[in-house]
UniProtKB/Swiss-Prot annotation:
Full protein name: Non-structural protein NS2
Functional description taken from the UniProt entry: Single-stranded RNA-binding protein.
Superkingdom of the source species: Viruses
UniProt keyword ATP-binding present: no
Family per similarity comment: Belongs to the orbivirus non-structural protein NS2 family.
Gene Ontology MF term list: RNA binding
Biased segments, Acidic residues type: 257-266
Positions of region (Disordered): 203-228, 250-273
Pfam family, one: BTV_NS2
Organism: African horse sickness virus
Amino acid sequence: MAEVRKQQQFTRSVCVLDLGQKTYCGKVVRAVDGVYYTIKIGRTVQCGVTPTPIPKSYVLEIRECGRYRIQDGTDVLSLMITESGIEVTQNRWEEWSFEALTPVPMAVAVNVGRGSFDTEIKYVRGSGAVPPYTKNGMDRRAMPSLPGITTLDVGVRDLRLKMRENREAEREKMERALSGGLDMGSCRMYGGGRNDVREITLDEAGPSRTPRKLSVQSNESRSDDVARRHAELVEMERLRIMKNEPVRTESMWCQSDSDDQSDEDHEVGGTEPENYITEEYTRRLNEVKTKYSKELSSLAMRVPKNEGNCGKPIFSKKCKWENVPIYNYDEASGNYRFVSVGSRTHYHCCANDLSYMILPAGGSG
């Protein structure tokens, strides 16, 4: 049998300020020359007299005995204050009537001891409109007589179990009851009418369409595939440059209609220096791609040439990169030119059409 977990109750505090000193709280406070009758209720209950409200407490100002309920969101504190005593609970207490109170939060400084400190309290004022031990006008145990229904001689829990175990039979019983004397709108109002929906055959629906076969792939696996494909292409580019083989890298990285722009990038700069695409640079490209995948998701990565145009910078970041190609980059024109292999403390991410480049430029290492 599953263990029934008891709902956890948090400690709540209420400070009663009885200005008329007619209630039990006011009498106790006057006897010890205090100001507030304070109650902390949680795992234990602590009562006492304090000169100030305590931190994060409800301050209840009253002048008469009465029945007060402080309602603060999901927190409920019910107090029964008389001339001879006080009762407090955080649980349901529905057999009595209440004066419902909504607290107002206040930022205050509490002056106590040798100084003061800042805290928050919540203030409410009760008028005593509901005398102590006033019976609730509605008896929750009494069954009302309502037109159109007949009270069953079973409990609600037993009824729910029966409805759950005989779902189909109960559904048919309801449909039979609704089938006579009610129009479709009224049936739908009661939740019925489902059996009257006409089924459409395949012949009536028209010619069938061959469904496309869709492959379901998670965002995580798709991102891994893109990162792996980029890493492979960057490595291919590095090996090509080491062998000084002319290829059309633009069409490899960005499969678009920018063939003319791709040809121009390859013609600019002539012969490219060997080995300037280092393994360290390749690793850094993958790091940037992974870290800023959201910003770069719609762009394809390109490896810089000896010189060319890479467009305007999307963002510039600080870094500590060593053994990477260094470029002179003109932000106004977007032109760049390879200088040497070394270290840099800044890099630019530049975009042109549907692709981007990572240029270590600016800030010598």
